[in-house]
């Protein structure tokens, strides 16, 4: 529509009179408003009916059109008048288009502002005039009347007012047509104008910010639709706005500047094309130096990238990569925001999981606890939505966090995995494939029970009861769940679950004992006993400090409330059912709830206790259900295969489960049906199944004889048969079962003992093992009845016929250890014979005869002879290892009885201790574990803890680490025992860990490796052993323990060695070890020189009483020795040696005892030198099989020369690095030189020492001679290193002893003297 060129208002032709439509009188200000309205309606009708082609009418009513734009109408106070005038004006613009009848710009502006104001009437759809308002809107939109305003200089004011009006009036009562006309009107202005000003843009965008969006949802929708429709036109304006605010920082350009990030999010959701020019600006903002600004951009982009159906990450890879970089932002809130975003991203965009995985991995190790926590939440939430959204790596991050140092993170990880397990493994919500993907969760959750924290243990118990085997299930379903869970668990998880039940049962026992004390009359002793029980119970609850106070309060309530005591008694009663248990817990909790408090920590602590002791899984009904499941597996009618286990596995695991439960819930087994099923198991071919069944009878069958005679009559012959001809384990259990459940046990045992004792035949060792087991256990359980016949059997058969004869020749394959199924029957019989001797003595537990003394000499002699008691050389190396282990274990077992410990001589103790340095890895490993278990249970005397000091000499890093852990555990157990038991203070000599030092010093002084007390290398070895123990003991200086240790060692220097008081050399060794100990203590502690409040007591068995006239203030360590002990380095005097000798010179490392290892060349050398694996890298997960390899099959491997050896390799220091493995399992190989066959055999060394570095510079001959030098390593044989082809060394040198070996051979020749002493 164009404007006429005339500057003045157009006048009608003629006399200037206004022509009104037919029937319409003149409209002036002289008439009433009602009359004006009446006449205007007719005018409106006239204009409505006119069209653009009516030229005559247009001319006729032109004056009227001009009149309607007068002040009278435009400023009329009556809204009906104004509405009708607006409708007329809209029609006038339609009719006269494209030339408007109004030529004044001011008049036009006034008219359009007037029309815009009338549009406000659209707000009320229920108004009688709404149709006219709608007509006005429709007319304006259809004609695009507002486009006339483009020619006005200040048209923006009109458009802003129009947009504001339309956005303000729209509401949910408007239909689609109203919205469409509004859109048409506004979009035409935007699309046909020269551009959108910032003010006009603000009127649109303001409707998108959250505050306005929530106030008027329809205005928000209108703005969205408008922007979508005009995207091509308005994008440039939007880009300009954001450019000024984001890049140029001109926040004053708009009042919406502070809402830019909200607007970007909304605009992106409307159409990403609106922001096509804005996104690069965000990348710039992501790199801002202002942390808060980066955080705001990250929050925004997180929403954009994470939005459903968003393709921003694929469309804008640079921005995506830049955003991912913020996962490593220095600002904690930014990293936190990124992690939170990852959850939405994983759920909405699984394809981006790969990009996120690496960044989440780094954040799972973030130093900030909240971030590690949120990583877990992110992954678990995605996994709960769909397991396919999280890959194995992401789940692995959660698994790692179960061991986080922070409890909150550990808890989140454990609970999250438990929820996934319940959803996908228990309820199978996503099929078997998903269940298989996370089948590891059950094992890893139970493994957490191994952690020391009580919080971890309690959470595992809670998870087990709620997620793994939900206690809310019906009994049959619950037991099916437990049955197959137990069958699928790995070994460590099974042990953890067993330990969990054991701990709960122990706690039930403590509560039962506490209730029993309440039944006794009040006394000081009773109160003290109660206090002890409460302290032990508190240790099994979270936050033991608070738990002690709450348990005291709970105990007080128990004393006052008899009903509460009765309910607690019912809860821990062996006959309490699961349903009764839940009811009891509710009742006890309800009683303790009053008075009600918002938080009641006392009640929470009691709940923890009740949850641990309540039997929510196992009762008689549950055991019956388990037995039925077992029967189905045996019959082949169970769902074993569907549950992912074979029937055999299900049966074996089911029996093992019942066996464990028979310890903790024996009463629940007492039913004929259960025992009938167990009898069927006894008849099965699977030895493990039968063994478990016997053990269940043993644990639960105390009432069988009186209440179930039919079961008794069937069971007795089966037990007899198992004791005579079953496996060794079955025989043991059968004998114990008879002893436990039958009243006439003497008769029953005699019926087994007599035929077995008559049928012993050493020539058929295969048939000897089970009888020896049965006889040993019978003699232990019924010593009075069988002591006399057993003495005869021991003397005539066990010792003379079996142990002192070698009937077969062992396999000379050179291995130091073989698998259990490869051990010869004769050796197995000999091992059982040694165990029989021990059981026989344990049964007697007295020393009235000389049986104990003479019997003890036998394992001692076995150790002296290195396992070859007859010394006929018939027995193999691996069999000798087995017998040494049996002999050492026998002395350990007997030492646990006070009566036998008293008669074990210091020499026998030293022999027993040296087994921990045996040359065979498995002997050291098994022996150390037996020693640790007995010590940690406080069964062995304190002196045996000193044996762990010798582990410093173990060449295998893992064995040293294990020994250190054992020491830490033993020391903490003893310290805790002293704290918890007031009576323990009377036995400090046998409990206080510091009192191990005198035993350790004495043991090291008698170490066969200490041949030359002033030898610097030997002194360094002594220091390593002392430091191995003292480092752990001196971690804390509790009660001035450092000065106590110093005084103890100084006191030892004022005594003599009780083992050989008149031997000056022996005493000198003792004093030198003392000086080394004092040196170590002084270097470790700055407070050791303070006065000790206590005077240490020394063991009279090892030290003479101090002589008051004897003052030993001599220093036995030279200045050079002190430097060596301080630095760990031995200065070697320069010697003229050949090139190879100089290259192969041994080096040492500070503070680490050097071990000579065999270094294999690239072409390989023959068998191993010693019993450590050649490479520490292969020892991380050691098992028995890793110790046995092809190299061990060679008794006398041929030494091959290397084709070429790099000079650098030859120069590798002997004591610095462990050699690379020549092959798997060189650990237990024995190598020797075939050319050495003509050499006279060396005296047998004491076993198991790691090889020593040569004191002087290594020469070619020393290196080569290591092969035959059995004495060089004190029982350790070395393989020759690869030889350089240029070397002139002759292989004859291999048969020569090294100088060190020659020197050490002399004291070894005195070894037989020790044997004579033992046999006196």
From Swiss-Prot:
Ranges annotated as biased composition (Low complexity): 1255-1267
HEAT repeat copies, ranges: 156-195, 272-310, 388-426, 709-747, 990-1028
GO BP field: cell division; DNA repair; mitotic sister chromatid cohesion; negative regulation of DNA replication
Localisation per UniProt entry: Nucleus
Domain of life the protein comes from: Eukaryota
Disulfide-linked positions: none
Positions with biased composition (Polar residues): 1158-1179, 1225-1241, 1283-1293
Coiled-coil ranges per UniProt: none
Ranges annotated as biased composition (Basic and acidic residues): 1180-1194, 1294-1309
UniProt entry keywords in alphabetical sequence: Cell cycle, Cell division, Mitosis, Nucleus, Repeat
Positions of region (Disordered): 1158-1320
Assembly behavior: Interacts with the cohesin complex. Binds chromatin in a cohesin-dependent manner.
Descriptive protein name: Sister chromatid cohesion protein PDS5 homolog A
Naturally occurring in which organism (per UniProt): Danio rerio
Gene: pds5a
